[in-house]
Each structure stands twice: as structure tokens, then as C-alpha cells.
Regions:
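Bacterial Sec-dependent N-terminal signal peptides
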Residues: 2-5, 9-12, 16-40, 201, ...
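Membrane-proximal, proline-rich intrinsically disordered regions
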Residues: 20-72, 299-315, 322-327, 335, ...
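Short, surface-exposed recognition loops and adjoining beta-strand edges that mediate ligand/DNA contacts
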Residues: 32-33, 62-76, 127-131, 159-173, ...
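Conserved, well-structured interaction surfaces
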Residues: 82-158, 192, 205-214, 372-379, ...
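Flexible, polar/acidic helix-loop-strand segments at domain edges
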Residues: 187, 326-383
Length: 512
């Protein structure tokens, strides 16, 4: 292989793992109809792996599943944003479902393009030294993670709950593992088994672990990011011993201590800073900002008194089913919720609790963020609190109740002032306590829908409004009752995808 060194310094600088490295030329600066032939192209293409996370961790992929649960109720004047999801009007032609499917496959295509380019480079196509290939390998590891992350999240939505005893017959996802844009429909893949889908996720994760060298990094995928993700995957696969081991080991590094004060907890969600963050998606005003997770919980426009004390007109408000989970001294109650004046037409102003976990980062606002996107925060796909909850649940289901209680009590001690460790003589009580704690801690982050699905639980929204008359009093919203195992817990393969891919013709999910 020809020796060349002109890109080594540039590449080394680009992998310096500082947040300013994210400020690069757009991914599309290199056309995807030809493979990359030098190191700088890999460096620039790296941006295309990270860009989609700003959308996929702050938009519909997070909020749509959350609004399908009992935790949030539409307001009487809501804009019908996510109305079909909240009412469980789930159809094959649903635009939200189609968009999320397409966005994940876009991420997969970008990952495939980079992985395939690397394989061609190793074959001697292009001018790369062995040293350069080793440096490029970090980016390839990130591409493997992106593909694993995308297929895993799609499996949670578009496939049944993983069951190792049935996975060989459960329907999985169409696995596209090469960058092969084709106009020939007969070349499109059909659905794999769910066993094959999860096998691919784990294989990609193994590849990523062998290539990504940084142990800890705020804005870049690190070994700790991979470990947190692997623990999450293991929990959903019911590999409880593995999940417990991974999460406990990550906690045991001591790199991500739980915050101890309400001020620090508030800063974690207001300013998006704190010791609990494992991986944070880089954002910068004006062009590198994600979606506004807080917008549906507050309303688009600010009143005359300005942020944050204006009267609110939100699309959704937290239900009493959620609010009543928080007891005395729980610091999350004062951070995740705030009492505002409700601005409702024809009704005297009244107080109501809004969901305030995503209040809008003032640093983004001061940088020139439009008021239409005022309630925008920087997303953190992996935080240490989730690992405490994984450890607690996994240890319990693996038969180690004392360890489960230890991690539950550790998280509670950091969140509840004056907390005294609780002992549990009944496994059922401990299981319910862990599930309640998971709901309280992770609310709004997109987990609860998947939790109900894998726990095989339903819900009933009846009589959960905060104030009579402010919720949308329509039976399929406010009186909605969903039974455990409802077929709509598994989303349909989008109609447009089935129409375009003949291999999917007879592979739609049951019920659609």
C-alpha cells in the first residue's frame, strides 16, 4: 500500500473529541454514489453519523411513544399534535410512523456507506497507510454503533417483544447491511426473524467495542456509551444477568455520580450539565439545534410577562396518575413539574401543573434561538440514572433481590430528601417499587411505552385529569383504556414501505 501522510495531522486533530469538532461541513459535501478514497472524506463524513441524533432524540421518536401512555392527557384546546398517537389511531399510513421508520433507515444507510468505504479501503482501493486505517477505524466503530442503535430502536417499535424461546419465528426487520441504493424492487430485503435482528445488533455492538477507544466522552460515542447501550439491549432481551453486570460495572467506575441537591438536579435539566450525563448530543445555534421537546408541554408563544412565568396553553398536561407517584421530599417533583397559570379561552385563569423537564436551555436562547423553539434542550440519550434502574430490575429478575434493593435505594437517596433505605420482604412489592421509580425518573424521555409493552401491562386514562374541564373530554383521549398485549403496542410497517418493497407484501404486523 502506498505510503502517504498528508492527512494524518488533520485526522488526529479532528479526532480530538472536543465539542467544537462537531462544527464541520455537512455530510452531503461528499456524494454517496461513490466511495471515499482518502482520510479527510471519512473525517467529514463522520458528521453525518451524528447529525441525525439531534432529530431522533428530540422529536417524534421520543414524544410519539410517550403520548401513547397514561402519563399525559391532551388539553381541550390542543392543536392535535400527536393526536393520532394519543388516541391510538394507529394505521399503516400514519405519517409519524412512516417518518420515524424512514429516518432510522437513513441513519443505517449512512452507516453502511462508511462501513463499506472502509472495507474497500482495506482492500487497497484508495491511498491509505496502515496508520490511517487504524485512525479511521474509530469512525467505523461509530458507524457500527449507529446501525446497532437504529435497528434496536426500530425493533422496539415495529416488532413484538423479544422472546428468546420464540425469536426464531418472530418477525424482525429488513436487514440492509450494505450500501446498495437500488431502483430494482426485487433486490429489497424482506423481514428477518427477530432473532436475526437482535443478533445483528449485538454483532454491530461487538464491532463498535473493538474500534472505539475513548473510555469517556461527552459529545462522542465512547466505550461507556456502548456499555450503557449494551445494558439497555440486554434488559429488553431479558438477559438479566448480563444487564445487571454491565450496568453495575458502569456505575462502579465512579465516573458518573448521582447529583445530590435540587439545584444540581435542576441544572441537569435546565442547563443540560451535570455529572450524570454519559453521552450528550452536540447542539449549537442556529443551524445545529434539535427539536423542542418541551413545546407540547408549554405552548408555542410566550405571554407578556415572558419566560418562564407566562400563562401557558399546552397541548398535553401530566395526569394525576403521574403526579401522584411523587411523594414528600422528592426533588423531581419540583424540577419535572411547575405550576403555571392556564390560559384557556372563556375560562378564568387557573393553576395547573405542566411538565417542566424540558424548560428550554437559556444558553441556547441567549444564542439567538427563535421563540418558536424556546423550549429546546440538549438531548442526553444515555444517563447514569437509567443504569441504576436497569441494575435494580435486572438483579431482581435474576433472583438477587438484595442487590436490586441496593440500587433502587441508592437512586432514591439521591432524589428524595431525608430518604431512609427501604427493605422489601415481598418480591412483588419490590418489583412494583422499581417500576414506579423507573416511571418517575425517566418520564418524558420515551421509555414508558416500551416498558408497558415489555411488562405486558395496559392502562386506563379515566379520571386522571388535574382539573375538571381542561382535558379534551373525548372518550378516545380522556377515557382511553388499553389492554395488555394490544396489537397496537407494535407499530405497523409503513404502507409506503410495503407498497415499494414486494418482499414485505405478506409480512405486515398482525392487526393491520
Amino acid at each position: 500500500m502506498k505510503k502517504k501522510n498528508i492527512f494524518v495531522l488533520a485526522f488526529t486533530a479532528a479526532l480530538g473529541l472536543s465539542s467544537c469538532d462537531m462544527d464541520k461541513d455537512p455530510y452531503t459535501s461528499y456524494p454517496m454514489d461513490k466511495y471515499m478514497v482518502d482520510v479527510q472524506q471519512f473525517v467529514d463524513a463522520r458528521q453525518g453519523l451524528y447529525d441525525p441524533f439531534r432529530t431522533m432524540t428530540t422529536g417524534a421518536a421520543t414524544l410519539a411513544p410517550e403520548f401513547m401512555t397514561e402519563l399525559f392527557m391532551p388539553m381541550v384546546f390542543f392543536s392535535n399534535t400527536y393526536g393520532d398517537m394519543s388516541s391510538w389511531n394507529i394505521e399503516e399510513a400514519n405519517g409519524t410512523i412512516e417518518t420515524i421508520w424512514g429516518n432510522y433507515y437513513t441513519m443505517i444507510a449512512r452507516a453502511n456507506y462508511i462501513i463499506d468505504s472502509y472495507e474497500r479501503a482495506k482492500e487497497g482501493r484508495g491511498e491509505f497507510t496502515e496508520e490511517e486505517l487504524q485512525k479511521v477505524a474509530v469512525i467505523i466503530g461509530e458507524a457500527y454503533f449507529v446501525r446497532a442503535y437504529s435497528y434496536f430502536n426500530m425493533a422496539l417499535l415495529y416488532c413484538d417483544v423479544y422472546d428468546k424461546n420464540q425469536a426464531e419465528t418472530q418477525m424482525g426487520l429488513p436487514l440492509q447491511l450494505k450500501y446498495e441504493p437500488s431502483q430494482y424492487a426485487e433486490k429489497y430485503p424482506g423481514r428477518s426473524t427477530l432473532a436475526a435482528t437482535y443478533k445483528q445488533v449485538l454483532e454491530d455492538l461487538t464491532s463498535a467495542k473493538s474500534m472505539i477507544t475513548s473510555e469517556k466522552s461527552l459529545n462522542y460515542i465512547s466505550q461507556h456509551t456502548l456499555q450503557a447501550f449494551e445494558a439497555r439491549v440486554a434488559l429488553h432481551m431479558k438477559e438479566y444477568g448480563k444487564a445487571a453486570e454491565l450496568s453495575a460495572a458502569l456505575i462502579g467506575t465512579g465516573k458518573y455520580p448521582l447529583v445530590k441537591s435540587s439545584e444540581d438536579l435542576n441544572n441537569l435539566w435546565l442547563y443540560d450539565e451535570g455529572s450524570e450525563i454519559i453521552w450528550q448530543i452536540y447542539q449549537a445555534v442556529p443551524d445545529e439545534v434539535g427539536g423542542s421537546l418541551g413545546l407540547p408541554f408549554h405552548g408555542q408563544y410566550l405571554g407578556a410577562s415572558g419566560y418562564p412565568y407566562a400563562a401557558q396553553r399546552p397541548d398535553f398536561h401530566p395526569t394525576t396518575a403521574l403526579l401522584e407517584l411523587y411523594g414528600d421530599g422528592d426533588m423531581r417533583a419540583g424540577v419535572y413539574f411547575r405550576q403555571y397559570t392556564l390560559d384557556q379561552w372563556g375560562v378564568p385563569n387557573m393553576f395547573i401543573y405542566t411538565f417542566n423537564k424540558f424548560p428550554g436551555n437559556p444558553l441556547l436562547q441567549k444564542s439567538g434561538l427563535s421563540t418558536d423553539n424556546w423550549y429546546t434542550n440538549i438531548s442526553e440519550p444515555f444517563m447514569i440514572a437509567e443504569q441504576y434502574l436497569i441494575a435494580a430490575e435486572a438483579y431482581l429478575e435474576d433472583g438477587n433481590a438484595p442487590e436490586a434493593a441496593k440500587y433502587l435505594n441508592a437512586l432514591r437517596s439521591s432524589r428524595i430528601q431525608g430518604y431512609v433505605n427501604e427493605t422489601f420482604s415481598d418480591t412483588g412489592d419490590l418489583r412494583q417499587a422499581i417500576r414506579d421509580e423507573r416511571t418517575k425518573e425517566l418520564v418524558g424521555e420515551g421509555f414508558h411505552f416500551y416498558d408497558l409493552k415489555r411488562w405486558k401491562l395496559g392502562f386506563n386514562r379515566s379520571d386522571t385529569e388535574q382539573v375538571t374541564g381542561v382535558q379534551l373530554d373525548v372518550s378516545y383521549f380522556s377515557k382511553l383504556e388499553i389492554e395488555a398485549g394490544d396489537y397496537r403496542f407494535t407499530w405497523p410497517i409503513p404502507k409506503a414501505e410495503i407498497d415499494a418493497n414486494p418482499q414485505l407484501k405478506d409480512e405486515q404486523n398482525p392487526g393491520y
